């Protein structure tokens, strides 16, 4: 299925049905009074996040979504039927913008999350509501309200814990196929990857994380060159970025480290130009194609010194898997720690956080703390 991560649609909710002016007509009851019913509610349009969908392709070709109008009220105090609602199923991670103002309306980041894109109009009132002590036979009724109408731009940002960043042919697809269940197309020419790929990395039956691989960036990507800038938004939700750098060179006369430093600086600069917030995310350096370097340790030290890198660095070979296990476990431990921090912060905000007793010593096997001097015995 074709990957589509952006679509513009128009949603038109249904109009509410009109109320009606009607009077009770029954034998031997000459003055039956008003019995006009209310109009039915117009159909609303909802969006529901579905984890079984991974593309917005359905909305690329079906741009107009119009709900039906509610039925008009009837005599004998009969209300008009409400119109059926329309539910649009979208991928988890879809962000809905107002197409005219650019305002972010909804961010559907949980499975089964439901939001109202356009609310149906309320039904009008029948003349039964206007009866009073001074107006026993009212002829007033109200029309139904118009439903909401919007032009919306839907943008998909995939949900991943780790994002892969690098030039074309840096080995991103090879790495994700090595450490996860993803099977992207791999070839020895640039721009083999044409759309984001997601892979689940399992470190144990109960521990896993998701990796996102996007098309490679090239110099000038922030100004529209290449394909990578089209998909950088998919890295916005990640917790850490893996900056893959190819430290090998097909040219035996060229210095691969010097070229790798130039390439790495180009990626960092394009990231800063595109989105400073994305550039500020935690970033780990991954030196790839270790199997093609004579002295891997010397290459790593030289690169870090010339690149001015002091953060986490891993030297791997995506082809034979060397060094990938250390990378996987380091990522899992980091992500688990970040999730614990988020959970503690949420618990503190909710008032449910349990602070540790400073008198408790885990090394004593959970024994109760001694009674302080002067305490009750």
Curated annotation (Swiss-Prot):
The lineage of its organism: Bacteria, Pseudomonadati, Pseudomonadota, Betaproteobacteria, Burkholderiales. Mg(2+) binds at residues 173, 193. Residues 127-148, 339-377 are annotated as: Disordered. Monomer. InterPro entries: G_OBG, GTP-bd, GTP-bd_Obg/CgtA, GTP1-OBG_CS, GTP1_OBG_dom, GTP1_OBG_dom_sf, OBG_GTPase, P-loop_NTPase. GO terms for cellular component: cytoplasm. Residues 160-336 form the OBG-type G domain. It comes from Bordetella pertussis (strain Tohama I / ATCC BAA-589 / NCTC 13251). Keywords: Cytoplasm, GTP-binding, Hydrolase, Magnesium, Metal-binding, Nucleotide-binding. This is GTPase Obg. One of its GO terms (biological process) is ribosome biogenesis. Its EC number is 3.6.5.-. Its main location: cytoplasm. Belongs to the TRAFAC class OBG-HflX-like GTPase superfamily. OBG GTPase family. Gene3D superfamilies: GTP1/OBG domain, P-loop containing nucleotide triphosphate hydrolases. The gene is obg.
